[in-house]
From Swiss-Prot:
Descriptive protein name: Cytochrome b6-f complex subunit 4
Subunit annotation: The 4 large subunits of the cytochrome b6-f complex are cytochrome b6, subunit IV (17 kDa polypeptide, PetD), cytochrome f and the Rieske protein, while the 4 small subunits are PetG, PetL, PetM and PetN. The complex functions as a dimer.
Organism: Nostoc punctiforme (strain ATCC 29133 / PCC 73102)
Classification via PROSITE patterns: CYTB_CTER (PS51003)
Coiled coil: none
Gene that specifies this protein: petD
Length: 160
């Protein structure tokens, strides 16, 4: 990786170029023809080859035909809904479960406002936001694992 020279704004030639509209894109390697003719086609062909390879090497599995009159004992949602499914399953009152599920997006919306006075980007210099993130991640993983377990072995919140 090469270091780029910072422009000298007191240079009259550079000021003349900036006045003509040649801004920060003037420095470095131009996009035409380098990126558009060489890099983009390689990325597009590589992505297409990966998709075709995945489609050929791992085709979609066709299972047994669906029977609308036979319902499985436990119906599980998709994997990304396991934590909120476990919240619903572990709380006895369904209204309380729905309110707890609604608190998940509200909590995610409030995360940026927890420590907005701290302008540092380093996580070690933002202990409150880092702690909230780590605790939230651990609770989400714990709830997701609990939802994947059978109903009789399911995790509880320790309250009921």
């Amino acid at each position: 990786m090469a270091t780029q020279k910072k422009p000298d704004l007191s240079d009259p030639q550079l000021r003349a170029k900036l006045a003509k509209g040649m801004g920060h894109n003037y420095y470095g390697e131009p996009a035409w023809p380098n990126d558009l003719l060489y890099v983009f086609p390689i990325v597009i062909m590589g992505s297409f080859a990966a998709i075709v390879a995945l489609a050929v090497l791992d085709p979609a599995m066709t299972g047994e035909p669906a029977n609308p009159f036979a319902t499985p004992l436990e119906i599980l949602p998709e994997w990304y809904l396991y934590p909120v499914f476990q919240i619903l399953r572990s709380l006895p009152n369904k209204l309380l479960g729905v309110l707890a599920m609604g608190s998940v997006p509200v909590g995610l919306i409030l995360v940026p406002f927890i420590e907005n006075v701290n302008k540092f980007q380093n996580p070690f210099r933002r202990p409150v936001a880092t702690t909230v993130f780590l605790v939230g991640t651990l609770v989400t993983v714990w709830l997701g694992i609990g939802a994947a377990l059978p109903l009789d072995k399911s995790l509880t919140l320790g309250l009921f």
